[in-house]
Amino acid sequence: EFRETAGGVMTKLIERNTTIPTKKNQIFTTYADNQPGVLIQVYEGERAMTKDNNLLGKFQLEGIPPAPRSVPQIEVTFDIDANGILNVTALDKGTGKQNQITITNDKGRLSKDDIDRMVNDAEKYKEEDEQNKNRIEARNNLENYCYNVKNTLQDENLKTKIPKDDSEKCMKTVKSVLDWLEKNQTAETEEYNEKEKDTEF
C-alpha cells in the first residue's frame, strides 16, 4: 500500500505479503509555501510511479495554517485490520486536525491475477522505474535545498548575521535555479545533481 509524494513517486508504507493486522506511519510535509491542504492518495501496486499503480482512494486534509513549505508535519497512518480493511489517517501534528478514509476488500482492490501481472511488470520495468524515481527525487532535492536556503535568508534571527551583499547574491542564485526548475521539468538526474552542486553555498 502506498501514498503519492511530489512528482508522482510512490512512498511504500506496507510491503506486499505483510502479515495482518499491521500498522505503519510516516511523516510527510507540504511542497508549497502557505499550502492550506494536502491530498492523500492511496495506491496498491509494485511500480515506482503512481500512474502505473491502482488507485484505491483519496481524501483531503484541509486547514493547515500558513507556513513555509516543508514546515508542517503531516503524520499518515496505514492501519490494516485482521479482515484486510484498510484505514488511512492523516494528522496535522501542528493543529491536531485529521481526516481519514476506509478501504474495504471489495473496493477496487486488485485480483490475484492483477497482482501477479503487476509483480511481473515491476520486474520488467525495474530499471526504467528506478531512473524515473531517481530523476524526480533529484529534482525534489534541488527544489527543497533552494527553499531551505531561501527560508534561512529570510529568517529574522539570521538576517543580521549574514552580510547584505552575500544574502542578496545567494537569493539571486536561488531565484535563478527555481526559474530554471520551472522551465526544465523533465531534465535528467545528472542535470539536477550538477545544478545542486553549482548552487551549494
Curated annotation (Swiss-Prot):
UniProt keyword annotations, A-Z: ATP-binding, Nucleotide-binding, Stress response
InterPro entries: HSP70_C_sf (IPR029048), HSP70_peptide-bd_sf (IPR029047), Hsp_70_fam (IPR013126)
Entry keyword Amino-acid biosynthesis: no
Pfam family, one: HSP70
Keyword Nucleotide-binding: yes
Residue runs in coiled coils: none
S-S bridge residues: none
A GO molecular-function descriptor: ATP-dependent protein folding chaperone
Family of this protein: Belongs to the heat shock protein 70 family.
Descriptive protein name: Heat shock 70 kDa protein PPF203
Organism this protein belongs to: Plasmodium falciparum
